[in-house]
């Protein structure tokens, strides 16, 4: 079990309280699909992903980005049991969707870039430490069924 300090909890809660899920979710998923184009293979049913412009304009990608952020909200609300919170989602991604678990880390990295850009100087080293810890726990939980 991961132990969280009061400061870490406060930082992560603060980040989420200021997030526009639609904007941040869309930008993060789009960035992942553009920067790491091999991740597009999991989104074949989402239509044309031919170039950056079509990805950025794709409403299905935008909606899925928002869904991802709401999924992270579940981790925020269950910080003391993220592993079990994501057990079913991990199973779905491993057994049914066959998503390479490294892609969770790539998306987490893109999410960090987008949030850091949005927060600017408020994204301090202390903030990044807490945020990276949170995302590392989430990524580990999502990859749990692969081990």
Curated annotation (Swiss-Prot):
It comes from Boreogadus saida (Polar cod). Involved in oxygen transport from gills to the various peripheral tissues. This is Hemoglobin subunit beta-2. GO terms for cellular component: blood microparticle; haptoglobin-hemoglobin complex; hemoglobin complex. Keywords: Heme, Iron, Metal-binding, Oxygen transport, Transport. Hb 3 displays a Bohr effect, which is enhanced by organophosphates, and a Root effect, which is enhanced by ATP. Belongs to the globin family. Residues 3-147 form the Globin domain. PANTHER family: HEMOGLOBIN FAMILY MEMBER, HEMOGLOBIN SUBUNIT EPSILON. The keyword Repressor does not apply. It holds the Pfam family Globin. GO terms for molecular function: haptoglobin binding; heme binding; metal ion binding; organic acid binding; oxygen binding; oxygen carrier activity; peroxidase activity. SUPFAM superfamilies: Globin-like. GO terms for biological process: hydrogen peroxide catabolic process. InterPro entries: Globin, Globin-like_sf, Globin/Proto, Hemoglobin_b, Hemoglobin_oxygen_transport. Red blood cells. Heme b binds at residues 64, 93. Hb 3 is a heterotetramer of two alpha-2 and two beta-2 chains.
């Amino acid at each position: 079990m991961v132990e969280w300090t009061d400061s870490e909890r406060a930082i992560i809660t603060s980040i989420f309280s200021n997030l526009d899920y639609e904007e941040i979710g869309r930008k993060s998923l789009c960035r992942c699909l553009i920067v790491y184009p091999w991740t597009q293979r999991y989104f074949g049913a989402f239509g044309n992903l031919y170039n950056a412009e079509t990805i950025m304009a794709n409403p299905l990608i935008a909606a899925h980005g928002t869904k991802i952020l709401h999924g992270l909200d579940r981790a925020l609300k269950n910080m003391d049991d993220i592993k079990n919170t994501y057990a079913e989602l991990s199973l779905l991604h491993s057994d049914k969707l066959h998503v390479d678990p490294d892609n969770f880390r790539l998306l987490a990295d893109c999410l960090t870039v987008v949030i850091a850009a949005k927060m600017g100087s408020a994204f301090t080293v202390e903030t990044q430490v807490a945020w990276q810890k949170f995302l590392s726990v989430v990524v580990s939980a999502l990859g749990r069924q692969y081990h």
